[in-house]
Amino acid sequence: MSFPIDSIKIKVESHFLAQQSSLLEGKYVFSYTVTIVNLSDINVTLKSRHWIITDANGAESQVKGPGVVGETPTIAPNNAYQYTSGTVFETPVGFMHGRYTMESGLGETFEASIPSFRLAMPGVMQ
């Protein structure tokens, strides 16, 4: 029996951090809060992350590593895990997407897609 991947829901909200940004230096700081919901009937553990980060100029970087914010959380059935992290762009707009490598309580490894989301300084249209 394979794990029902569609039972993992991922939602992301981003915020521009004006006080930490420096527009003259081309430093645009953002936070983002990720909520991962486990709608299955077994535990899942987030093992690693892979982010693809693209600024408004098309410059792309990738971030890979174990867990998130120093944790490899186990999410119980019908529960959620939430964390906040951040990134810095050289442009006032950027996009992020990626995937989490997860492991079910049955030992099955699978990938959960992180949908693309926009990070933008308020008032910027791009």
Swiss-Prot record:
Annotated protein name in UniProt: Protein ApaG
Taxonomic lineage of this organism? Bacteria, Pseudomonadati, Pseudomonadota, Gammaproteobacteria, Alteromonadales
Biological process terms from the Gene Ontology for this record are: error-free translesion synthesis
Species this protein is from: Shewanella denitrificans (strain OS217 / ATCC BAA-1090 / DSM 15013)
Q: Which residues form the ApaG domain?
A: 2-126
Supply the Pfam families for this chain. Answer: DUF525
Instruction: Please list the coiled coil stretches.
Output: none
Q: Which NCBIfam families match?
A: PRK05461.1 (NF003967)
Q: Which domain of life is it from?
A: Bacteria
